[in-house]
């Protein structure tokens, strides 16, 4: 398929997978344009196509804080159509252009609608050439974003084309697979780790893709620093501590500070339970707020996949170590 939607919570490897798809497309002779879905996306895609480079990555990041008129978005879509068709003529039979769009939840609805029209038009333009399917040039769109916010996008009438996309949801990796990957990767690096130690490392990672990467790297570095060829339990413990610190800064901190003040107050109340599910009654008491207030922000945090229901009247974190981060870095002085 040439239309794909990759979803997953923070740190689950969406951007890594997006980059791998770009690499594979480039190796097969496709032109690749990658960008982040903030306002002005269509303009940046057009500029990238004008550059005529085989792979173009925009450095534009951040959420969209504005809206674009439907008319303006359509005009930009028409401009893109001409540039795409012009670029496709320069590619070999069966090749095409890949637009890899990260942070899809921050996209302008109008610009996504323009891309939807563009996608259909380019397919129609290629069908009109009369060439065999194998020789037609194509346009592929791959989007990556957070599940809850992408869910909102799928409800927009103007971007229903996304519902036809192949959807890939990234989540936790099974611990046996993590253990086996540690054993093999360490072996490939010229070191050794026994099954028991690799199993400990897998449990420390919780199967979270980013933590798997961090724990593996830091336990390896610990052994190398000690000039050893064998990774031991102490390396796993040291590596885990370093991994937690980096995970805090890369995942938990941006999430925490990206929430609204009432949402932060809500999850700060949850952090007091140290990893156990929290009673809604306790949140109301700790925050000194009403039932309706708690219900409102419970719903918003569940929608944004920060927390989830854990039974009747209970909630828990969905983001690894978020409660520990709040306790260690936010509430430590209290």
Which stretches of residues belong to each language-model region?
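Walker A/P-loop nucleotide-binding motif
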Residues: 1-20
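Winged-helix-like regulatory helical subdomains adjacent to P-loop NTPase cores
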Residues: 10, 207, 211-291
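Conserved NTP-binding/hydrolysis module of P-loop NTPases
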Residues: 26-32, 39-71
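Conserved small helical "lid"/interfacial subdomain of P-loop NTPases
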Residues: 170-197, 204, 215
């Amino acid at each position: 398929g040439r239309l794909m939607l990759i979803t997953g919570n923070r740190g689950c490897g969406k951007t890594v997978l997006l980059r791998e798809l770009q690499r594979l497309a480039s190796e097969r002779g496709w032109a690749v344009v990658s960008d982040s879905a903030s306002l002005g996306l269509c303009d940046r895609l057009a500029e990238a196509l004008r550059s005529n480079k085989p792979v173009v990555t925009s450095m534009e990041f951040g959420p969209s804080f504005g809206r674009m008129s439907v008319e303006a978005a359509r005009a930009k879509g028409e401009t893109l159509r001409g540039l795409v068709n012009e670029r496709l003529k320069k590619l070999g039979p069966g090749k095409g252009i890949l637009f890899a769009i990260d942070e899809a939840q921050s996209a302008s609805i109008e610009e996504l609608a323009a891309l939807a029209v563009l996608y259909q038009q380019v397919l129609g333009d290629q069908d009109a050439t009369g060439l065999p399917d194998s020789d037609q040039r194509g346009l592929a769109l791959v989007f990556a974003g957070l599940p809850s916010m992408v869910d909102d996008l799928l409800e927009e009438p103007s971007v229903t084309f996304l519902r036809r996309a192949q959807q890939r949801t990234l989540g936790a990796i099974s611990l046996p697979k993590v253990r086996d990957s540690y054993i093999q990767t360490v072996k490939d690096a010229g070191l050794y780790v026994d099954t028991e130690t690799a199993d400990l490392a897998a449990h420390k990672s919780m199967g979270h893709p980013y933590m798997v990467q961090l724990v593996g790297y830091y336990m390896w570095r610990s052994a190398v620093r000690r000039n050893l060829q064998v990774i031991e339990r102490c390396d796993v413990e040291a590596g885990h501590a370093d991994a937690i610190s980096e995970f805090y800064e890369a995942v938990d901190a941006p999430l925490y500070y990206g929430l609204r003040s009432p949402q932060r107050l809500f999850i700060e109340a949850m952090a007091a339970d140290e990893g156990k599910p929290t009673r809604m009654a306790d949140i109301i008491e700790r925050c000194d707020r009403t039932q309706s207030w708690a219900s409102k922000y419970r719903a918003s945090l569940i929608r944004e996949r920060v927390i989830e229901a854990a039974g009747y009247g209970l909630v828990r974190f969905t983001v690894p170590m978020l409660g520990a981060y709040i306790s260690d870095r936010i509430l430590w002085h209290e």
